[in-house]
């Protein structure tokens, strides 16, 4: 279950190795970037909002792909926790107030 993380924007979700990361809403993957810890950040745009899924071990979709809510976008590596950030027109939104976990 998600828990607030005071070191980053968003919530941190503990995830086991090979656990599937799914899109929380319909949208388009606008960015897939490799992070310093050799995991990935995937950014999904939906209207004026974007959701960032950080520390994914293996990405299953390419940039530009349209996805539906619940569709798999990646797998966790078991060494990192998933961080989910939500932004509306550049302003942080607490994902726990919007996303049904």
Q: Would you name each region that the model predicts?
A:
Residues 1-40, 68-69, 93-96:
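Surface-exposed, glycine-biased beta-strand/turn segments
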Residues 8-10, 48, 81:
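Short, solvent-exposed beta-strand edge segments and adjacent coil->beta transition regions
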Residues 17, 33-36, 57-60, 77, ...:
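A generic structural motif
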Residues 17-18, 47-48, 79:
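Periplasm/extracytoplasmic soluble domains of Gram-negative envelope assemblies
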Residues 42-43, 65-101:
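Conserved, short, structured surface segments that act as functional micro-motifs
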